[in-house]
A protein has these predicted regions:
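Conserved ABC transporter NBD signature motif
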Residues: 56-67, 71-72
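Conserved ABC ATPase signature
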Residues: 88, 129-136
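Conserved ABC ATPase "signature" region
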Residues: 96, 100, 107-125
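Catalytic Walker B motif of ABC-type/P-loop ATPase nucleotide-binding domains
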Residues: 154-158
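ABC transporter nucleotide-binding domain
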Residues: 170-270
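C-terminal coupling/interaction segments
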Residues: 269-313
């Protein structure tokens, strides 16, 4: 459905995207995750044909975005972070205008609007001015215009930003329903949003694609956490010794709050993400005479992976 190959984009001296590549298959729900300023919105604008990359190619359903922008846009439903709503129009009037702009045949517009209204739960609000609706329902109107023309691809940029918890839950339920008929790319900086809605995550940091993984794969992996019962240690020697254990790929000081603990703490990543390194690490600690305080497996989460990538970028 989407193929992005070696895309680069700069704004003057600022490199927003560097050699970004990824693919999304039809029917997937994929999260584009990154901190503010990571390049997510730039990526989306390039995908939707509203911004040209400096280099690279982008195709949607086999059609080149740069060469056939209009044709690609006809296949995309797009909800930007700030939905382009006219507050003085009624919901029905706004959707009617959008149907006309989408070149939906006049004799079919009523049916298209009815389907979008039903899908987004707006039937009781058709005659109300958009400006009188709550932010949650205004977001529903934005989603209704995005799906009005029955797109094969739905691109959502921060769809729950600024909503209260109840509205967030409602919009997420709506997105799940919409994903049954469209491929969905969801851009967000909220980790829980990706965990709640997506099957797969792309992590973009400082304009670079740092990770591409199924959430189920992340949930099935773990690291070994080693804590030594000593106030001072030869950290470099410990790291070197741990790195020589068979099956170890990376050794680092533990991230987050553990760095502030009095006891030296190490995070050990296996080359085989599902391997249990604890027995081999225990043997090393015993043979080296290390004062072992704690040794355990620590399940990797989206948060731990994201924080690890963010701090090493």
């Amino acid at each position: 459905m989407i193929d992005v190959e070696h895309v680069t984009k700069s704004y003057g001296p600022i490199e927003a995207l560097r050699d970004v590549s990824f693919s999304i298959a039809s029917g997937e729900i994929v999260g584009l995750l990154g901190p503010n300023g990571a390049g997510k919105t730039t990526t989306i604008r390039i995908l939707t044909g509203s911004l040209q990359p400096d280099d690279g190619t982008v195709t949607v359903n086999g059609v080149d975005v740069l060469e056939h922008t209009r044709q690609v846009q006809e296949q995309i439903g797009y909800l930007p972070e700030t939905a382009p709503l006219y507050r003085e129009l009624t919901v029905q009037g706004y959707l009617g205008m959008m149907a006309e702009l989408r070149d939906i045949p006049e004799e079919e517009r009523r049916a298209y609007i009815s389907e979008a209204v039903y899908a987004t739960g707006l039937a009781e609000h058709l005659t109300r001015p958009i400006g009188e609706l709550s932010k949650g329902f205004r977001q529903r109107v934005g989603l209704a215009q995005a799906i009005l023309h029955k797109p094969r691809l739905l691109i959502l940029d921060e769809p729950t930003i600024g909503l209260d918890p109840t509205q967030v839950a409602e919009v997420r339920r709506l997105i799940r329903r919409l994903s049954r008929r469209s491929t969905v790319l969801l851009s967000t900086h909220i980790l829980s949003e990706v965990e709640a809605l997506c099957d797969r995550v792309l992590i973009l940091i400082n304009g670079r694609m740092r990770a591409d993984a199924q959430l189920s794969e992340l949930a099935s992996t773990s690291d070994a956490i080693l804590v030594l019962n000593e106030e001072t240690a030869d950290v470099d020697r410990r790291l070197l010794s741990l790195g020589q254990v068979e099956g170890v790929e990376v050794v680092s000081g533990a991230d987050g709050s553990r760095e502030r603990l009095a006891f030296p703490t190490y995070r050990v990543l296996a080359a085989d993400r599902q391997a249990d390194l604890c027995p081999a690490i225990y043997d090393l600690a015993r043979n080296e005479g290390w004062p072992l305080r704690e040794l355990r497996q620590d399940a990797r989460t989206l948060e731990s992976v994201f924080n690890e990538l963010a701090t090493t970028s």
